[in-house]
Amino acid sequence: MGMPTTMDLSHLPGEEGPVATVRNTLGWIRSGVDHLLAQHERFGPVYRTGFAGYRVVCAADPDMVLSIARDNQSWSTSLAWLTFFQGIDSKINRAQLDSPLFLDFEPHRNARKVLQPAFGHSATSDYFDAALSLYEAAAERWVARGQVSFKDAIRSLMVEVSTRIFLGEDDAAPEFERALIEYWEGPLALVRDPRFSRKWRRSIRGHRRLCELLRARIASRRASGGDDLFSRLCAMTGTSDGLVDDDGLVRLVIGVMSAAFATTSSGLSSMVYLLAEHPAWQQRMREELLALDSPRMTYADSQSLDVCMRVWKETMRLYPIAPYCARRALHDVDLGSYRIPAGTFVFGLISAVLRDSALWTQPERFDPDRFTEERAEDKRHKAAFLPFGIGVHTCTGMHLANAEVMAFCHAMLTRCRFSLERPYRARHTYAPAGIVSGPVKLRVERL
């Protein structure tokens, strides 16, 4: 890729080596943000470590995180994620990629041009209606049973939602679920060789299967059309003057589906845990949702909710889904008083900023009111709250993700109240999206 892979980082505080890499990777997976805060306290705002087989520099200072997230002339998103996923998809080795996650500059702008119409207001409203119906049916099943192992159930449900709104299919969820999960979990493998790592081998297999499933559908979608994202993209890329070919189309959809199912299911698991622990906030959200004028929730309704959105934001602060922004240095860059060599793999620790006591009042406490206009703690620094990124790499599906969460809240909270079967003290984990620990097993009672 034209970038150095070995750099002298000995001038930085921290630790490296196989033992440190295993310890740090397991710390991320098991203890998430708590592990990162402990590392920050031990080594300072900039330190070197190992993660999932790579040498990494971590930055926890808000100004540094903002600089890393916004400065596209010094930091490359493309090279970071290409490095992280290299070996899962054979085409990564030839840098023939079209997912916005793997691109910078003009290719990134071209990919977003293809995606943005498929995430416009009208399209997102259609996706919202389809998702709401599935959420309502699931909530009814859980109420009828009186209990649900929520983390497992929501993961399966979100694959079902993704295949409905992104592919327009109702029966494809089971075959996509296994492939998506296998693919998504691969980058956390400590050994990145399919001969010695079952997780890495499964990830390669999952990606290959996703490509097969999607490629087999392209011709029929171009012929028949549809309101789902895949059909819209098939129609657009068939006449897009070569911005994205069919391989690129497949990669775009894999990127969207992977991000959508994993991140939204993780966020909802964390939010439901918090609401089970804080029934007063569960009731406040319920009252706001029941007060809507519409006989059935609409996409416009989802954008008008205040209490529900504050709870969702506080969930993403306490249990960040994306704990860091990954970059590689395009040239030698200064982070504080340290010189970072070109090619260095760098993580801007968004999750550490989300617990910074200089920005957040009692940051360990669940307090959605910190997002009110009066307190506006999320406005104290431009890097204080970046759950969907910033600048050109802001998540294209941000509005859909927020709307999906509001739709789920309406489906669940207007039908039932819920509590934990066995209360437990949860922690933030990373597997590979940030998520609350434990199974989140619920007792569910009809209103």
Name each model-derived stretch.
Residues 2-37, 55, 82-220, 247, ...:
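Cytochrome P450 catalytic-domain helical core, especially the substrate-recognition surface
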Residues 9-12, 40, 135, 179, ...:
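Cytochrome P450 proximal C-terminal region
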Residues 13-18, 227, 274-322, 336, ...:
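Cytochrome P450 I-helix active-site segment
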Residues 20, 120, 207-267, 282, ...:
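Conserved cytochrome P450 catalytic core segment spanning the I/J/K helices
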Residues 66-87:
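Cytochrome P450 catalytic domain signature, combining two hallmark sequence patches
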Residues 74, 348-376:
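Conserved cytochrome P450 K-helix/beta-meander segment immediately N-terminal to the heme-binding cysteine loop
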Residues 97, 101, 296-300, 338, ...:
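Cytochrome P450 heme-thiolate "Cys pocket" and heme-binding signature region
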Residues 261-288, 398-415:
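Cytochrome P450 catalytic-core helices
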